[in-house]
């Protein structure tokens, strides 16, 4: 809720309630090797969690399901360490504005924050606001042996690793895009989920029966449409940047991707899709008006809520279909970062480590929040009573395996989203894909020349 601010100091022990979750087989998700940048010493050293007893940490969080869950266990951290946690939870846009103001002023008032790496990664790195964590991860007097950095999924580690190989944050949450589809309608026809873009289009055409049912939907609204666009772009072999960090838009892959994206929405989406954000797409899907929808996997909770959704229990979840250039899923990663201006850097790191530990990742997944650790998906508790459909867990894991950054790693991500977003809107409205890509290329190259020096 925009404008809402929550401040807190944890004061009493929180108890974990066992959640009923889905039965799913253990599937290995390739983690990233620590490599030479974060190596493990031969001798084990016990972490002294009480070394900063009496310290008060100031934390900033953007509103997020992961945050809602981890806050419940703050008293546990305080008991473990003897530290106190002061924290603020505010909407992401306002939170980032506050963070930028304080970082620019150099106040040092924030010790750690829950970073949106897909927006902040390069900008904050170039500004020197991330405290590099490589040495902390290497130091066994600071990092518990069972923390298991190699348990983090490859896409999550890539999201927090900078071009100079410094690690800027510890991953908390990874949101891949997946395919939502009307399983009941597919079952009636003996279909499984589409495996290729061509199959997806064929099924959209077969199911499209307006105004009662539309075959397909994705975001059409400018800026918002930049996130699903990544999937189509990668599927056709497109890249954001050339090796020398110039615009890579002026290629046939971008034009082909735009032809597919705009064409699918013109032919098979509900009227007015050019102004659809995730909310409008989700609403149409939940009302039973759309057969297939591509967006972030964590929208599933509302689809399965009978109080909100007419299609609860009728939704299938699948990894995105492969395209001509390969199989990809855009991912968006959040992570706990230590401020380079903090006066309590090591203490703040202990909090970030605790928050992203196996124990807390397990708690998050049991609460229905996707996590960056591979091992968590094999929890025995997940094999108990299902909280979500089997296909949700499988789609999530399959998507983590093929995850790829959903936005370009540049300083001004927001401006890029506006540039490509307007181009997509114009193409949906009927402009020639080659023309809108040519104009977007000029604008994007100008942006890079101004901001990437």
Please place each PLM-identified region on the residue numbering.
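N-terminal secretory signal peptides
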Residues: 1-20, 24-34
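Hinge/lid segment of periplasmic solute-binding proteins
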Residues: 45-51, 117-176, 228, 312-318, ...
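Long, aromatic- and glycine/proline-rich binding clefts that accommodate carbohydrate-like moieties
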Residues: 45-46, 53-56, 150, 315-318, ...
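Short, solvent-exposed loop/beta-turn-alpha elements that line the ligand-binding surface or hinge
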Residues: 50-54, 134-152, 236-256, 305-310, ...
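Extracytoplasmic/periplasmic substrate-binding proteins
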Residues: 73, 120-122, 227-231, 235, ...
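Extracytoplasmic "Venus flytrap"/periplasmic binding protein-like
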Residues: 76-152, 184, 188-195, 291-292, ...
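Extracytoplasmic/periplasmic solute-binding protein
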Residues: 157-172, 177, 199-247, 290
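Glycine-centered hinge/linker elements that transmit conformational signals in sensory
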Residues: 204-210, 244-274, 320
């Amino acid at each position: 809720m925009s404008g809402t601010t929550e401040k807190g100091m944890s004061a009493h022990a929180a108890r974990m309630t066992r959640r009923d979750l889905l039965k799913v087989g253990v599937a290995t998700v390739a983690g990233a090797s620590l490599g030479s940048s974060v190596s493990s010493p031969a001798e084990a050293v016990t972490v002294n969690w009480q070394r900063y007893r009496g310290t008060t940490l100031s934390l900033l969080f953007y509103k997020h399901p992961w945050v809602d869950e981890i806050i419940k266990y703050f008293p546990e951290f305080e008991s473990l360490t003897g530290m106190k946690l002061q924290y603020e939870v505010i909407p992401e846009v306002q939170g980032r504005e506050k963070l930028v103001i304080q970082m620019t002023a150099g106040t040092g008032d924030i010790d750690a924050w829950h970073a949106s790496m897909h927006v902040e990664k390069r900008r904050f790195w170039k500004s020197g606001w991330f405290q590099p964590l490589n040495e902390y991860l290497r130091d066994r007097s600071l990092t518990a042996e069972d923390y298991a950095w190699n348990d983090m999924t490859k896409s999550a580690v890539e999201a927090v690793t900078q071009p100079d190989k410094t690690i800027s944050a510890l991953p908390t949450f990874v949101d891949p895009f997946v395919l939502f589809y009307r399983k009941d309608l597919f079952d009636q026809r003996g279909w499984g989920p589409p495996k290729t873009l061509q199959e997806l289009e064929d099924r959209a055409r077969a199911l499209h029966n307006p105004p009662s049912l539309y075959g397909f939907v994705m975001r059409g609204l400018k800026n918002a449409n930049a996130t699903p666009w990544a999937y189509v772009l990668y599927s056709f072999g497109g890249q954001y940047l050339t090796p020398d960090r110039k615009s890579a838009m002026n290629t046939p892959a971008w034009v082909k991707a735009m032809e597919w994206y705009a064409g699918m929405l013109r032919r098979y989406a509900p009227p007015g899709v050019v102004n659809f954000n995730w909310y409008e797409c989700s609403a149409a899907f939940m009302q039973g008006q759309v057969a297939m929808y591509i967006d972030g996997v964590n929208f599933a909770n509302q689809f399965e809520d009978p109080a909100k959704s007419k299609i609860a229990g009728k939704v299938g979840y699948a990894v995105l279909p492969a395209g001509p250039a390969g199989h990809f899923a855009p991912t968006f990663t959040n992570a706990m970062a230590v401020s380079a201006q903090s006066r309590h850097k090591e203490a703040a790191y202990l909090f970030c480590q605790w928050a992203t530990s196996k124990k807390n990742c397990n708690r998050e997944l049991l609460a229905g929040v996707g996590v960056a650790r591979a091992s968590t998906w094999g929890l025995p508790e997940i094999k108990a009573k299902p909280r979500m459909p089997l296909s949700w867990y499988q789609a999530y894991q399959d998507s983590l395996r093929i995850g790829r950054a959903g936005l370009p790693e540049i300083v001004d991500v927001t401006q890029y989203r506006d540039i490509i977003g307007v181009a997509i809107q114009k193409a949906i409205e009927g402009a020639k894909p080659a023309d809108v890509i040519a104009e977007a290329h000029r604008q994007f190259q100008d942006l890079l020349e101004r901001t990437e020096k």
